[in-house]
């Protein structure tokens, strides 16, 4: 069971740089992609970044400006559930039923004697199959978009005097979206109208 929700994950990082100019004006362009899948299936972080860096220099004046943009998408929760759930399952439980479909219930923990129903081992609820939920669309995703602009100016009227000014502006937007369908095993035993969940949160910052 513990091998089912995990995978071998490799981090992929790619970048592109272009720079040039002369003694007066210099420029630098950057674009990068960082894909970091998680060990749990269906999790990971995907980041795309870009920046433009400009520098202008004369005898007494230096002006620079850097604009950077970052966009990150993170899938926080595996559709397989938590790893701890799998460590608690008995190895003899069968993932699939006799028809090859993923079983919803692994063990009811009940037996009947003379018309009376008893629970085995103190269990009062059935053990659900966490892999049953991978058949349905679900989401626990975080998206973040950030723009940052840094401006700096330096003026040196004489060799022993330097005047400088810095301005940095940052804008961030973040979305968190969480969805579980009504067929998810988390809602087993609940009334139909209480099944399923959806949550969306949007944050802005400067």
Give a label for each model feature.
Residues 1, 39-40, 49-146, 164-206:
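Surface-exposed loop/interface segments of Gram-negative outer-membrane beta-barrel transport/assembly proteins
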Residues 25-27, 127-128:
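Acidic/polar, low-complexity linker and loop regions
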Residues 6-8, 19, 42-44, 55, ...:
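Generic marker of residues within folded, mature protein domains
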Residues 11-14, 47-51, 147-152, 156:
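Short alpha-helical segments and helix-capping/turn motifs at coil-helix boundaries
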Residues 161:
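An active-site-proximal structural segment forming one wall of the substrate-binding cleft
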Residues 11, 22-23, 57-61, 156-158:
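Outer-membrane beta-barrel channels and translocator barrels
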Residues 1-17, 27-43:
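Short strand-turn segments of transmembrane beta-barrel domains in outer membranes
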Residues 17-21, 30, 53-57, 66, ...:
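Transmembrane beta-barrel domains of outer membrane proteins
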């Amino acid at each position: 069971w513990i091998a089912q929700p995990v995978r071998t994950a490799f981090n992929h990082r790619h970048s592109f740089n272009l720079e040039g100019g002369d003694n007066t004006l210099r420029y630098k362009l950057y674009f990068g992609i960082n894909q970091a899948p998680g060990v749990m299936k269906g999790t990971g972080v995907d980041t795309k970044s870009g920046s433009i860096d400009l520098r202008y220099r004369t005898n007494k004046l230096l002006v620079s400006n850097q604009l950077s943009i970052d966009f990150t998408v993170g899938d926080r929760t595996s559709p397989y559930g938590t790893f701890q759930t799998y460590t608690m399952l008995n190895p003899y439980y069968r993932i699939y039923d006799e028809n090859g479909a993923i079983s919803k219930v692994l063990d009811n923990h009940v037996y009947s004697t003379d018309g009376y129903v008893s629970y085995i081992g103190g269990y009062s609820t059935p053990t659900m199959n966490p892999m049953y939920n991978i058949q349905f669309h679900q989401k626990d995703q975080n998206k973040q978009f950030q723009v940052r602009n840094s401006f700096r100016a330096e003026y040196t009227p004489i060799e022993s005097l330097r005047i400088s000014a810095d301005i940095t502006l940052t804008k961030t937007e973040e979305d968190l979206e969480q969805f579980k369908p009504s067929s998810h095993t988390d809602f087993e035993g609940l009334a139909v109208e209480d099944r399923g969940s959806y949550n969306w949160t949007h944050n802005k910052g400067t």
